[in-house]
Each structure stands twice: as C-alpha cells, then as structure tokens.
Amino acid sequence: MEGDQRSGPPAQSLLPDGHLVLWTLCSVLLPVFITLWCSLQRSRRQLHRRDIFRKSKHCWRDTDLFSHPTYCCVCAQHILQGAFCDCCGLRVDEGCLKKVDKRFPCKEIMLKNDKAADAMPHHWIRGNVPLCSYCVFCRQQCGSQPKLCDYRCIWCQKTVHDECMRGSLRSEKCDFGEFRNLIIPPSYLTSINQMRKDKNTNYEGLASKFGKQWTPLIILANSRSGTNMGEGLLGEFKILLNPVQVFDVTKTPPIKALQLCTLLPYYSVRVLVCGGDGTVGWVLDAIDEMKIKGQEKYIPEVAVLPLGTGNDLSNTLGWGTGYAGEIPVAQVLRNVMEADGIKLDRWKVQVTNKGYYNLRKPKEFTMNNYFSVGPDALMALNFHAHREKAPSLFSSRILNKAVYLFYGTKDCLVQECKDLNKKIELELDGERVELPNLEGIIVLNIGYWGGGCRLWEGMGDETYPLARHDDGLLEIVGVYGSFHCAQIQVKLANPFRIGQAHTVRLTLKCSMMPMQVDGEPWAQGPCTVTITHKTHALMLYFSGEQSDDDISSPSDHEDVKEAE
C-alpha cells in the first residue's frame, strides 16, 4: 500500500503552473508596452517641438543629449536634453521653447532701418560659453562655475564675466572679432538693400570702408556628405559667421547660392566647399555658369573641407583626405584666411558613340581629377552599383575599402579588362601611341589618384617629367591589372608612363569597357573619347598640410626629378 502511494505523482504537479506563465508573459510584454508608450510620447513631443520650431525666429535643432554641461538660457536649470539654436547658440529645455523668442532675439542678418549702420553694438547672450574662453576685461577663464553664468557675443565670440559686464561693454561697438575679414556684416546688407531700391549697383564705394583685407567667405556644405557630418558643420559655421553666408547645397543649389557674390566687391569672395570631390565639381560647374552669364568679376576662389572618402582633389590642394572633426571649425576658418590662390586646369571629356551615323548627341563631362578605363573603373562601377541598392551600408570608410578590396581581388582572378591594347587606340596630341599588353589607361590632371596614391610619381626611384595641374598638360599612365594598381598604391611598383599631352584621344574599337570620370563610372560600348582643355578654376591651396604636389613657384620645382 505504501509503495503504491509513493509511486503515483501528485495530481497538482501535472497541471501547468499558472503563476509562472503569468509572470513570464508580464516580464516579456511589459517592456514591449513601455517601449511603445515611450516611442509614442516621444513622437508627440517631436511633433510639438517641430510646430514650435516652424513658428520660431531661431534656427532650432533638438538633441537627446548635450555633449557637455549645459544650462537652459531661460530657467537657468541644468539640462541633459533640449534644443539649441544653430545661429546664435542658445540652449533651452523643451518647456521653455515658447518663451525664448520674446526674451532672446536671434542673429539679425540685416539691421533694421532705424539702427545706425556704423555703430552695431555687441549682441550678448548669457551662459554656456565655450570651454577655455577668457574674459575680455580681466583675462580670467569664463564659464568655470557650475551654473548659468557669464556672457558671449554671438558676433565677435568675445566672453565676459557677469561681474565684469559693465554699461560700456553693453553699448560698445562690435568689431566682429577674429573673423571680421570673413563675415558679411548686417549693416553691409542693409546698405545694399537700400542701394538696390535706389537702383544703384556701385557697391565698390560701400565695400571700401571694410578695407582691402576683407574677403567675405561663403560656405557651401553638402549635408549628406561624410555620414551627414555636413549637417553639423552648417550650424557651427552659422554661429561663427553671418547665417546668410552659409548654404546647404542639397536645399539651395550652388548656382543660386553663388549669386550672393554679385553683391560683394570684385575679386574678393572666397568659397569653402564642405563635401567630397563630387560636391567640389558641382560648385566649379556653377562657377563656369557664372562666367557664361558675364559675371567674371565676381568669380570666387574655392577652398575645400573634405568629407567622406577619396578626396584626391582636396589632398592635392593641401586640405587633407578627410575631415572628421580633428580640428575645430574656427581653425578651419583660420586656414582659409591663410590659404593662397592658385589655378586648376579643367578638362572637357567628350564621348562619341559609334554606329549611329552621328545622330546621337555626344556625351560631355567636365574632368577635374582623372579619367580612366580599365580595372579601377570596373571596381568603381561595381561599388557604385551596390551602393545605389543599399546606400546605408556604405557609410563606413573601412567597409568601403573592404568592398574595393573584394572587387580588386576578384578582378585579379577574372581579369575582365585584359588585352586592352587590342581594343583601344590611343593618340596623344594627334600622334598614335603603341601600347604594351595593358589592362587599364589612366589620364591624370592632379597629383593624387585612388584615395591618396601619387600615381605619376610611383616609387620615386625613376626620373619622370614634371607634373602640374595648371600647365595645360595631362599625364597618361598604363596599368597591367588590379594587382599592379595595388602594388603602385603601396609603392612596390611604378606605373607604365605613356607620356604627357595637351589633347588625348582614345578609340574603343569593340566590346563594352568600364570608364570613369572623377569617380563617376559607367559601362561604355564602342566610342571615341576626346579630352581637351576647357578652362581654369581659381582654387585655394593650404600649405599647412603639405601634399608634396608641385603647385608652388617655379623655383620650388628645381628639386623635382625631370626626364632626361
């Protein structure tokens, strides 16, 4: 009897534990409900903030976390999240957004008519002064107390302690600080507006009071370049300059933005392009359109702040291969002020298809960097095709280089561009050139190619003709394949230097071949490619980051190896 009772399990253990199931469901579903509720509340807050942003005179951007200790300019409380103005730098929490416009005006791009144009006072805002800033009165550090304290002028960026702020400072005329020679003062635009009403377009006399050192700067930034780094740069430049000088080229095309040059003195304007080589080419095309319109006197000089990958043109001009925030924006402006003007050759690439009895219009491109046919164009074409399908996957430099490595390795095995010399005829200045067994031909205008490789120079152990980007000459080289390209990039091999020429003509006799102009690839059938000089572009060269390119005076070229 006792054995039978022990062998049978309890009836209760056969049933599922209802409490355990209930607690399991709660532990799984409760975080889901909390996440959904928080997401809904956040969406509602964002809609509410956007409505306020749209009606406000400030240029607000919201953030979930400020990068350094921040205090609300309205209630003076410490805040972790909220909104900040891209133009004047005000920082507020969500609850104080509606009160800001009444108490704190934003930067005025133009003065009101009743203000004296020659006596613009400082525009002070309190709190959140930059780190390592010093009082203009006592020369001691500002912003060192853990509270909303001290003042900053949103035009000249000077800072002053609360206790040092006096009536004389409040009414003192603002001199626009360190970057006065780059800023377009609101008083100037007010005077221009009045002159245009009077149908007077002689702006030279108006600009003379700012001196010969006044070289106003226009910022043209691509907000989509460099994993959207351009968007943050727009705000930083608006704080240091007049917001009217800063443009997002994805919203305002360069040809429209550059019309601001026509309101400024002749031959005085500088432009800083924040983006990749493609954005620079876009801006240079817009400048060419200004020449067609007869606006040669207003043509600006162009500097580059490189974003993204590649950037061979900016590297050639001394601006580096890519900006990742390693130096402050203020230092970028100092570099622009120190830069020297040079010229850059621009070339017309005309592609005429065969077999259409000249009925199809030739395709035309403008080349700043290089043209190529062969393995490097094939890698660019494959990369471009995959990036168009999934752009979000190609935002990392390391990943992009890995993809290029994959396609380069694949081409080493497949050799899709072999026997190029049998498919192409090459003419330099009208003379046909016999080619060895090559897989690619590259036509260079600048010193750098392929993301930082000095292709014409190679390993540097051979004599080679002088190469410049302002002499009206192109350098033409050949490569034996993808593996040869890789060897050249790590300085283990020299390219096959074909020669230099003023005019290059390539005839593709048969089959499809990959081609590219300045990184824009396509697949091309039988055709004739003619490259001729188009124009010069006025660029700015920064000597602080030496690129070893031959762009200085002739005396500096004596040490360069020349062909015998």
From Swiss-Prot:
It catalyses: a 1,2-diacyl-sn-glycerol + ATP = a 1,2-diacyl-sn-glycero-3-phosphate + ADP + H(+); 1-hexadecanoyl-2-(5Z,8Z,11Z,14Z-eicosatetraenoyl)-sn-glycerol + ATP = 1-hexadecanoyl-2-(5Z,8Z,11Z,14Z-eicosatetraenoyl)-sn-glycero-3-phosphate + ADP + H(+); 1-octadecanoyl-2-(5Z,8Z,11Z,14Z-eicosatetraenoyl)-sn-glycerol + ATP = 1-octadecanoyl-2-(5Z,8Z,11Z,14Z-eicosatetraenoyl)-sn-glycero-3-phosphate + ADP + H(+); 1-eicosanoyl-2-(5Z,8Z,11Z,14Z)-eicosatetraenoyl-sn-glycerol + ATP = 1-eicosanoyl-2-(5Z,8Z,11Z,14Z)-eicosatetraenoyl-sn-glycero-3-phosphate + ADP + H(+). It is a single-pass membrane protein. The chain crosses the membrane at residues 20-40. Disruption phenotype: Homozygous knockout mice are normal, reproduce and behave normally. No gross or histological abnormalities in major organs, including the brain are observed. The phosphatidylinositol 4,5- bisphosphate-signaling pathway in cerebral cortex and long-term potentiation are affected. It is found in: Membrane; Cytoplasm. Keywords: ATP-binding, Cytoplasm, Kinase, Lipid metabolism, Membrane, Metal-binding, Nucleotide-binding, Repeat, Transferase, Transmembrane, Transmembrane helix, Zinc, Zinc-finger. A zinc finger (Phorbol-ester/DAG-type) spans 57-106, 121-174. Highly expressed in brain and heart. In brain, highly expressed in Purkinje cells of the cerebellum, pyramidal cells of the hippocampus, mitral cells of the olfactory bulb, and neurons of the substantia nigra. Lower expression in neurons of the thalamus, superior olive, and lateral reticular nucleus is also detected. Expressed in platelets. Belongs to the eukaryotic diacylglycerol kinase family. This is Diacylglycerol kinase epsilon. The lineage of its organism: Eukaryota, Metazoa, Chordata, Craniata, Vertebrata.
